[in-house]
Every structure is written in structure tokens, then in C-alpha cells.
A protein has these predicted regions:
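Extended beta-strand/beta-hairpin segments
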Residues: 1-47, 55-132
Length: 132
């Protein structure tokens, strides 16, 4: 995974400006909670999982010279807190190749992060507001 720091800055209402190296985007919540100027944080998490899965499958198939013409991944949350990945593989693939690609799909770094034993450390920095 990337060693870049992801910086998030407060915007208008609940909107947040995200900077990742030279890339930028906005996260927000839908109306009426906020202005719906970008995907929600949960949707960004699903996007990370889907794109990581697709990249891992593509890289593996290409490395082995397999005839994978296209890979699409749709990811959604289930009400019970489960994440479901639907993977569409288009190509001239043997059943054993499909099985191997599905195994690879479950081993992408984001998938492993979400299903592993993860700890998050919060390091506070408190800056007092200037008094007027």
C-alpha cells in the first residue's frame, strides 16, 4: 500500500477536502444532512476495496498471460454490516483460472486490511484558538 499521507481538511458543512499526494477529492454526506458534493466516507471505503480487488485480479492475470479481457467489481454494504463484492470476469478462462482469480481477489491489500486484526491509533493535536 502507498506510504503517502492522506490529509483531510474541513470544508463547508460536512464536506471534506481530501489530498493524497498530487490527487484531490471531496467526501461529503447526501442531502439534507449536507450538500452531497462527493461520495460518503463509507462509499470511499467500498471504492478502495473494489479498485484494489480489480487491480489485483488484473495484475495477476496479466502476469500469467491469461485471457482476461475485462474485470468489473461492484461492492455494497448489506444491512447486517456485511460487505458484498460482485466480481465479473470476462475472458477465455479455464475454471481453475477463475478459481485462482477469485482467491487473488480475496487477498488484495485492502481486503486483507478490512478482514484482518487492525488497530487504529489516534494522536491528538490541540491548538488553542486565538483570544480576541
Amino acid at each position: 500500500m502507498s506510504g503517502r499521507t492522506v490529509s483531510v481538511r474541513e470544508g463547508r458543512r460536512l464536506a471534506r477536502t481530501i489530498a493524497i499526494g498530487p490527487h484531490g477529492m471531496t467526501a461529503d454526506e447526501p442531502e439534507p444532512i449536507s450538500a452531497d458534493t462527493g461520495p460518503t466516507p463509507g462509499e470511499l471505503l467500498l471504492a478502495a476495496l473494489g479498485s484494489c480487488t480489480s487491480m489485483a485480479v488484473r495484475a495477476f492475470a496479466d502476469r500469467h498471460g491469461w485471457q482476461l479481457h475485462h474485470v468489473d467489481v461492484d461492492v455494497h454494504f448489506e444491512p447486517q454490516g456485511q460487505i458484498v463484492k460482485n466480481i465479473r470476469l470476462v475472458g477465455d478462462l479455464e475454471p481453475a483460472q477463475v478459481e485462482r482469480l477469485l482467491t487473488v481477489a480475496g487477498r488484495c491489500p485492502v481486503h486483507r486490511l478490512l478482514t484482518g486484526d487492525v488497530s487504529v491509533t489516534t494522536v491528538p493535536t490541540v491548538v488553542a484558538a486565538a483570544r480576541r
